[in-house]
Swiss-Prot record:
SMART domains according to UniProt: RNAse_Pc
Gene3D superfamilies, per the entry: Ribonuclease A-like domain
Family: Belongs to the pancreatic ribonuclease family.
Protein name per UniProt: Angiogenin
Gene, per the UniProt record: ANG
Recorded superkingdom: Eukaryota
Description of activity control: Has weak tRNA ribonuclease activity by itself due to partial autoinhibition by its C-terminus, which folds into a short alpha-helix that partially occludes the substrate-binding site. In absence of stress, the ribonuclease activity is inhibited by RNH1 in the cytoplasm. In response to stress, dissociates from RNH1 in the cytoplasm and associates with cytoplasmic ribosomes with vacant A-sites: ribosomes directly activate the tRNA ribonuclease activity of ANG by refolding the C-terminal alpha-helix. In response to stress, the angiogenic activity of ANG is inhibited by RNH1 in the nucleus.
Organism, scientific name: Papio hamadryas (Hamadryas baboon)
Length: 146
């Protein structure tokens, strides 16, 4: 009986040891996605917004060519990875059922070195995300709706 309990605890601890790094890695990828692409309450959404937000989020060394910020409720973005607000789009990609307000910042000028100058494009778009364990970890594209 004691040996059975010891074996159970050993197997449990090994399983926990294998699961925690995976969960931590997924959580890192999700947090990285949010840091690069989520801004729930933007101010301005113009060229100045792009330049300051890209700089503040450390996306300017070297200057990133293009980056899209998704605005709105984080729960609705997460829901793309399930049936509540998403449909399959191929592989591990999902397309949102509803459009999101987005700002796309595109590098203006040719140099990848700071100071980075960006042009902002605002719009409402359906977005395509890559999901892992029910969370978005990659913004694949955004699709303009007429």
């Amino acid at each position: 009986m004691v040996m059975g309990l010891g074996l159970f605890l050993l197997v449990f601890m090994l399983g926990l040891g294998l699961t925690l790094p995976t969960l931590a890695q997924d959580n890192f990828r999700y947090r990285d996605f949010l840091a690069k692409h989520y801004d729930g309450t933007p101010e301005g959404r113009n060229d100045r917004y792009c330049e300051s937000t890209m700089r503040r989020r450390h996306l300017t060394s070297p200057c990133k060519d293009t980056n899209t910020f998704i605005h709105g409720n984080r729960h609705h973005i997460n829901a793309i990875c399930g049936d509540e607000n998403g449909n399959p789009y191929g592989g591990n990609l999902r397309i949102s059922k509803s459009p999101f307000q987005v700002t796309t910042c595109k590098l203006h000028g040719g140099s990848p070195r700071p100071p980075c100058r960006y042009r902002a494009t605002r719009g409402s778009r359906n977005i395509v995300v890559g999901c892992e364990n029910g969370l978005p970890v990659h913004l694949d594209e955004s699709i303009f709706r007429p």
